[in-house]
């Protein structure tokens, strides 16, 4: 068996399909519902940056800081982020499906650190999930800022 937070593009699609099947109680339409949701969240229109995201990213970039996106999403994140300001300003984009681990796995955080060339204490994670972002980021030794 795979470790609980190990992932890949295939595993992420299967995990999301299982969530849809559970929510819709294995209805005959589950496959169609999953396909619609998969398509929907692969489109730019489905995403809305936080209202203060632009000012936060601009402040970081103006100070010469590296800004990266690190998400429990799949490789579609690259195309989506490239088309949405301020996400398109990010220096690097990390999708869990490409890293091979999803948050809260320590391996996710270590891989991002290695690819950024940073020590844990040099990283500020801005996130909205109390467990996957805030608690896991702190456990990894990162600075964290919770947003809603």
Model features per residue range: what roles?
Residues 1-58, 62-63, 75-79:
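N-terminal helical cap/lid subdomain that shapes the substrate entry/recognition surface
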């Amino acid at each position: 068996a795979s470790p609980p937070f190990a992932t890949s593009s295939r595993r992420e699609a299967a995990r999301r399909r299982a969530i849809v099947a559970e929510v819709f109680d294995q209805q005959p339409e589950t496959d169609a519902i999953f396909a619609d949701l998969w398509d929907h969240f692969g489109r730019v229109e489905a995403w809305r940056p936080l209202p203060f995201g632009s000012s936060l990213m601009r402040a970081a970039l103006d100070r010469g800081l590296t800004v990266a996106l690190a998400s429990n999403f799949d490789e579609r994140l690259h195309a989506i982020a490239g088309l949405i300001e301020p996400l398109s300003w990010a220096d690097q984009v990390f999708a869990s499906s490409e890293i091979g681990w999803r948050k809260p796995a320590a391996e996710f955080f270590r891989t991002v650190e290695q690819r950024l060339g940073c020590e844990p204490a040099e990283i500020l994670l801005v996130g909205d999930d109390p467990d996957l972002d805030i608690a896991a980021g702190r456990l990894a030794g990162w600075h964290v800022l919770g947003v809603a």
